[in-house]
Amino acid sequence: MNEQEAKEFLIKDLKFTEKDIDKLDIFRNSLLEFNTKYNLISRSTEKSIWSRHILDSAQLLKHFNINHKGIIADFGSGAGFPGLVLAIYNKNPEFHVKLYEKSPVKRKFLKAVSEKLDLNIEIFKNIYDENINADIIVMRAFKKLDQIVKISRETLKKPHKIIILKGKNAQYEINNVSLDTNYSYKMENSITDADSKIIV
């Protein structure tokens, strides 16, 4: 999928508005500007931000109500994928995104973009600093599944859904993690990469 096709998919299939696309374009341009000085994303993906990063993040919208009310927490938010993309899409005033990122440089970028786009988000430096109150947890290129389950058990205060973007080792990680009866899951293919999976 090329960049134009990715944009068209966002509009036609995921129902992003033209205003959303404009905001995503500002996000993309800010990312490219920051990336000249800091390593926010791989330089090899700079020409495929719409398909490789934005659409990859936006596909998670299929897994919760588009008018979702409540809190979404993005663990290891990095350059804002998927958390910022989800925040741009959902304008419900009762929808709130928390971004957790340990890198000071990346937190600086997230703060700058969220202020520029007037997004309803909070930024934190460490997922272990508090008992996290969230309905949905999203992760992309974060930790291995056994570590994610451990964090979920130790830091989350209430029942929650976890949505994880994983690479080609997804099934191997599932086979090697201990899931008790409180957890159930399904796995499906990513629309942006044949080797990637989404675990819900």
Which ranges hold each PLM region?
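Conserved beta-strand segments of alpha/beta enzyme cores
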Residues: 96, 120-122, 161, 182-186
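Short amphipathic alpha-helical segments
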Residues: 111-112, 149-152, 175-176
